[in-house]
């Protein structure tokens, strides 16, 4: 009798041990074991981050060093990436171009972020920053990566393939970042670019957050941009997933209200300007120099080859200036024109100077924030 009891006890012990081993394979483990778990079994934990993926430079270099001409230090590790608020959608990251898929009907939203457009939670630096007072900095090192700094100053780029990433720039100069003619490859990514109102050289004002003085393309993506009068200024470039807001009006050195735009192009461009999946807000009043949210102006030549796609746009005298007579290759598609500042998105309406008969010009599926389709009036 005692041998039967002992044998049953041994079987029970072995069965309990077997169940414990099987249970540990598919639950409670700190490692990723999703490939070993049955569909109907316990939930398996997988690793991953909700932060947006970085372009290649951030994966291969560390913090920028204290010397402007030195190589970035590989020994300083960045702080963990910040995670967007759970109620917000992560930024679009289909490659470094930020190309988003076919837009969903996104109207009647309380804010751009609620409709999946960039806001403060999905733009700007993702790491802890180190204060750095550079003042005016003429960057002359090809391939330099500036990362992890909270810069007080301005960057004037006389070099190729410079990347500014996970950085904040507070400028008191004409611009935050400027690319000089003859140079190429500038990228400004996951950064905040702002200024102190009243401290700039234009009678206290500041003009350009990112300026492209050359003929090469500049990429600006996932950036939080504010204060500057003509925030993103270029004829060619790739502007995607940015949050441009809180432009501050000022009277310039000429004694006039500075005309303000979140994006401005003066025409005569040789390349392609892409403006895709941004939040572009110009709250400047009509009495204080409001021009456009997006201003495509034929100031220095014909406007050509511009894509304005899947943006949240609001403010300005007109929300969009479309290039005027002679403009070609202008594609305006799938944008939301918000009424948050004016019933017509801009103070006088949605669009002016649209050249409907221009070769390659397309206006398609653009809506007000309440869902109404927008059709441009003929250019006078």
Residue ranges and their predicted role:
Residues 102, 107-111, 116-127, 284, ...:
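Long, ordered, amphipathic alpha-helical scaffolds
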Residues 26-125:
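N-terminal low-complexity, Pro/Thr-rich disordered segments
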Residues 2-30:
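Secretory targeting and sorting signals
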Residues 143-150, 161-171, 183-198, 214-227, ...:
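Right-handed parallel beta-helix
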Residues 116-120, 125, 206-217:
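Short, basic/low-complexity N-terminal boundary segments at the transition from targeting/disordered tails
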Residues 130-134, 151-153, 171-180, 195-212, ...:
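Extracellular beta-strand/beta-solenoid scaffold signature
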Residues 95-168:
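N-terminal segments that cap or nucleate solenoid repeat domains
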């Amino acid at each position: 009798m005692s041998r039967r009891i002992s044998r049953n006890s041994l079987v029970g012990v072995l069965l309990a041990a077997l169940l414990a081993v099987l249970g540990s394979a598919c639950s409670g483990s700190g490692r990723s074991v999703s490939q070993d778990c049955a569909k109907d079994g316990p939930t398996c934990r997988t690793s991953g981050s909700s932060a947006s993926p970085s372009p290649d430079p951030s994966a291969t270099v560390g913090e920028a060093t204290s010397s402007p001409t030195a190589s970035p230090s590989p020994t300083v590790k960045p702080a963990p990436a910040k995670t967007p608020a759970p109620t917000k959608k992560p930024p679009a990251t289909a490659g470094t171009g930020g190309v988003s898929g076919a837009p969903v009907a996104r109207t009647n939203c309380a804010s751009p972020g609620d409709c999946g457009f960039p806001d403060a939670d999905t733009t700007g630096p993702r790491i802890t920053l180190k204060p750095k007072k550079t003042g005016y900095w003429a960057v002359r090192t090809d391939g330099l990566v500036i990362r992890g700094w909270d810069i007080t100053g301005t960057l004037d780029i006389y070099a190729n393939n410079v990347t500014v990433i996970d950085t904040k720039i507070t400028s008191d100069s004409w611009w935050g970042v400027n690319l000089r003619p003859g140079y190429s490859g500038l990228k400004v990514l996951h950064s905040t670019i702002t200024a102190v109102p009243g401290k700039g050289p234009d009678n206290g004002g500041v003009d350009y957050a990112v300026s492209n003085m050359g003929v090469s393309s500049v990429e600006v993506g996932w950036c939080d941009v504010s204060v500057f009068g003509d925030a993103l200024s270029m004829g060619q470039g790739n502007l995607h997933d940015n949050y441009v807001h809180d432009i501050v009006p000022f009277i310039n050195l000429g004694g006039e209200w500075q005309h303000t735009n979140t994006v401005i192009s003066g025409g005569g461009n040789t390349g392609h300007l892409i403006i895709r999946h941004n939040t572009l807000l110009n709250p400047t009043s009509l009495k204080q120099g409001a021009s456009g949210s997006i201003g495509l102006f034929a100031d220095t030549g014909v406007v050509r080859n511009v894509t304005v796609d899947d943006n949240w746009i609001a403010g300005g005298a007109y929300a969009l200036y479309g290039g005027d007579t002679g403009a070609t290759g202008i594609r305006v598609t799938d944008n939301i024109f918000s009424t948050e500042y004016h019933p017509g998105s801009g103070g006088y309406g949605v669009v002016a100077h649209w050249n409907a008969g221009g070769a390659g010009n397309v206006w398609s599926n653009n809506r007000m924030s309440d869902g109404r389709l927008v059709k441009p009036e003929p250019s006078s």
